[in-house]
Amino acid sequence: MNTPSSFAAACQARHLRLGVVGLGGVGLPLADAYTRAGYAVLGYDLDIQRVQALAAGRDVLRYHDLAARLLQSGRFEPTHDPERLRACDVVAVCVPTPLDMSGVLDTRPLLASAAMLARVLAPQALIVLESTVPPGTTRKLYAETLAAHGRPDLLLAHSPEREDPGAGRSLTSVPKLLAGLTDEASEQVHTLYSTIFTTPVRVASCEIAEAAKLYENAYRSVNIALANEFSNICARLELDVRAVLDAAATKPFGFQRFEPGPGVGGHCIPKDARLLANVAREVGAPATMLEQAARIHAERPRFVVEECFRLLRARGGAVHPRVLIVGVAYKRDVDVTTNAPALSIAPELSLGGAVVHWHDPVLGPDAILCDHAGRALPRVEVLDRTTVAAYDLVLVLADHSSVDWAVVATHARATLDTRGALRNRI
């Protein structure tokens, strides 16, 4: 698009062809938002099986149910061929930004996507980096990689994803940060996203958008750590931590409620807080609170295990008590086990002599939970009164809405509810 007016006209007429690189938990909902706004969307992914599943309308993210809707829209096409992206006017990059074994950002997915797009995109195409990255990544790493591949002409912007899996919140209703490396890129991404998102928020630089996203998740990390530490205190005082939180939440200012739990999980919160701590270290700034929060998160599963055995001892339990874990996914109603607390709690329970089984109605049939020796633990498919009553302790790690919690509350011999799922169920 040669002029701002021609780009704006193409947006209004929905004549732009949009691409999405990476069809996972960020890219697929974004593709859905694009198609709902009326744009034709080409979705690219390295995983050919994922592409084939989407082409057939089969869900690859059970908590979204997007595949059939995308297929029925008639405006979405998945592909495994990067050359197809040549036809796109705008491409959103939604590749993973994991940490490597040393806790440092693994830049390989970013570099690979930049090299690929440099090879195939038409002149003056717009790239919108949606992946969560440290400040300076868009300008230094991504733009310099494009230039190194002979494509300084490509426009580049950053608009960090704000996906909240399982929350039921419309992606397009969440305010959308955005910034371009140039005025032209900034104007284009704002013009485009004004036709898709309810509240596009243009900020002064890509670095501001990058830092804001890391701070958002670091804020959650620190406050969840505080909630978990406070729940430990309440446990020692024999106080219901959620009753205390209910009381505190009546204050209309200066308080935001964060729930305690068995530990943090998922892709974002642990990683993004670590990324921000890494940035602090690089610039010589302290990150004491972030580092302490990380330690609290690391210790939390062990605290849950100790509480389990304390409860069992108090009941005069067997040498090998039977424990049923309900909810292995990292959060409510989400089919994801990445960094889930259950992955470390179950092995510790089995190492301590417990006979551990598990139930999770959200996870697919291929899901596995292992003991301390790496052996798959038995899965319980049906959670009824007979099943629940067969265990010395029911440990609640995820409060899925499809579980009949009244059955658990009524028929369990003993429970450790880390999510508040059993409150007011009896």
Where on the chain are the PLM-derived regions?
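Structural/interface elements that position substrates and couple domains in central-metabolism enzymes
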Residues: N2-I426
